[in-house]
Regions:
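Charged, glycine-rich active-site and insertion segments that engage polyanionic ligands
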Residues: 1-34, 111-113, 121-168
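Clamp-loader machinery-focused feature within the broader ASCE/P-loop NTPase space
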Residues: 1-97
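Proline-centered helix-kink/hinge sites
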Residues: 39, 78, 109-110, 141
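Hydrophobic/aromatic beta-strand patches that form the interior of the parallel beta-sheet core
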Residues: 42, 86, 116, 134-136
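Short, well-structured alpha-helical interface segments that form or flank functional binding sites
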Residues: 65, 97, 101, 120, ...
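CheY-like receiver
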Residues: 72, 104, 148-152
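Conserved catalytic/switch belt of AAA+ P-loop NTPases
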Residues: 74-75, 98-117
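A short beta-strand-to-loop transition that corresponds to the Sensor-1 phosphate-sensing loop
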Residues: 89-91, 117-122
Length: 168
């Protein structure tokens, strides 16, 4: 949870990589995560998250396209990694019906399953969703922390105050 533009999706992908990649993984596994094509990684990033993104209603299964919703993905066992991870970005756009469809997976996740829900407005989620999640609040860095990071990267001749506020 946090304001727009703080890197929540980047953080979610980093956490996902740590959960899916191990010492036996190869560069192809890393590339598959980066391109959102890893078989144990489901990345939902729509402008509006609708009920069919979470679960299919009866007679809505598409044999050609196969697995296209979060709940069906979560019900499967991992195929190449020890864990499986579903990331739902823009969760603040889910209506109550979509959130309720996700509840079962949050209440009783299968083993080695992680669900990362990204929102710009956590108050838009149902209390039942919020209460079943571990919340990580992503806050903007202050100037001192940004300068320390710049120095750690070997950029000591630049100060964060050298940039206009819209760039930081």
């Amino acid at each position: 949870s946090g304001s727009v533009g703080l890197g929540k999706q980047i953080l979610a992908k980093e956490i996902s990589s740590k959960l899916l990649i191990n010492k036996n993984s190869n560069q192809e596994d890393v590339s598959l995560i980066e391109s959102n094509n890893h078989p144990d990684y489901f990345y939902l990033n729509n402008d509006k998250v609708l009920i069919h993104h979470i679960t299919f209603r009866k007679n809505k299964w598409d044999e050609e396209k196969g697995q296209r919703n979060v709940n069906d993905f979560l019900s499967m066992t991992p195929s190449v990694a020890k864990n499986k991870v579903a990331v739902i970005a823009n969760a603040q756009t889910m209506n109550d019906e979509s959130q309720n469809a996700l509840l079962k997976s949050l209440e009783e996740p299968s083993q080695n399953t992680y669900i990362i829900i990204i929102t710009d407005r956590h108050k838009s989620l149902l209390n039942t969703i919020y209460s079943r999640c571990q919340v990580i609040n992503v806050n903007p860095l202050n100037n001192a922390d940004l300068n320390e990071w710049l120095i750690s990267k070997g950029i000591s001749d630049v100060n964060v105050t050298d940039f206009p506020s819209f760039m930081s």
